[in-house]
Every structure is written in structure tokens, then in C-alpha cells.
A protein has these predicted regions:
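C-terminal active-site subregion of NodB/CE4 polysaccharide deacetylases
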Residues: 38, 49-52, 56-133
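Extended, charge-rich helix/loop segments that form flexible
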Residues: 1-39, 43
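Catalytic cores of peptidoglycan-degrading enzymes
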Residues: 46
């Protein structure tokens, strides 16, 4: 909120943003997730169960984080998921261990949060992003 508040201040935005019960804090419910999952433009994927940084965890903990959310999404949406997103997504937050665990769960693609451009030869578990502000 501090960063957001500073940006809004620079933009001379007058309304105050509260850190409690703000629209930025609202999460999607399963009804909304199911609705968006039916759209061809979107895919629903995993992002760990509790948003812990995978590379900081033991093998067993990392596996539980990855498997936990995949099982929940499979059950709620009644389908296999193939996309995932690393918490934080910077290079030091995932490794070949996490990629192997994701592949074992049937995940086919997991973008990073590293800035850059992809090619047809890019690793689908290390995809780059182009950031826009």
C-alpha cells in the first residue's frame, strides 16, 4: 500500500486507499473462477497452496505446496490443469527441482516473472514477461 499510495500521490489522486477491505484485497470465489475458466481466452492454473517461495522449502514441503493447490483446482473445476505460476517468479525462487515437480504433476507451462522476450525455442518453464505500466 505504501508504494501504491506514493504512486497515487504523484498522480495527484485524491481518494485515500485503506489497507483493509479494499478492492485490491478481494479474491475471486469459486463461482467466478468457474465462470472465467469456461472462457477460451483464459486458463486457470496453480500458484502454490500458501504462496511460499518454493526454492526456500525442503523437497517435501515444495511438493506439498505444488500438489496441494493442483488437487484443489482439479477437484473444484473437475479438470486437469496444465498451467502454473511460480510465487514471486524471479530466477532465485525456482529451480530445476520445481520444474521437475511441476512436470510430474502434468504441468506443461510455468512463466517466470523475469523480464524479456520469448522465442519458439524458449523453455516453457522459464518463460519471460513483458511488463507494462
Amino acid at each position: 500500500y505504501k508504494i501504491t499510495t506514493n504512486i497515487l500521490k504523484d498522480l495527484k489522486y485524491k481518494k485515500k486507499i485503506s489497507s483493509s477491505n479494499h478492492i485490491l484485497d478481494k479474491k475471486m470465489n469459486w463461482s467466478q473462477i468457474k465462470k472465467i475458466d469456461k472462457k477460451t481466452l483464459f486458463t486457470v492454473g496453480g500458484h502454490t497452496k500458501t504462496h511460499r517461495i518454493l526454492s526456500f522449502l525442503s523437497d517435501n514441503e515444495a511438493k506439498k505446496e505444488i500438489n496441494g493447490i493442483i488437487k484443489i483446482i482439479k477437484k473444484k473445476l473437475n479438470k486437469k490443469i496444465i498451467h502454473y505460476s511460480y510465487p514471486e517468479g524471479l530466477r532465485h525462487t525456482f529451480s530445476n527441482r520445481e520444474i521437475l515437480l511441476l512436470k510430474q504433476e502434468g504441468i506443461e507451462c510455468c512463466p517466470s516473472a523475469e523480464s524479456g522476450v520469448n522465442t519458439k525455442n524458449s523453455n516453457l518453464f522459464k518463460l519471460k514477461r513483458i511488463f507494462c505500466i
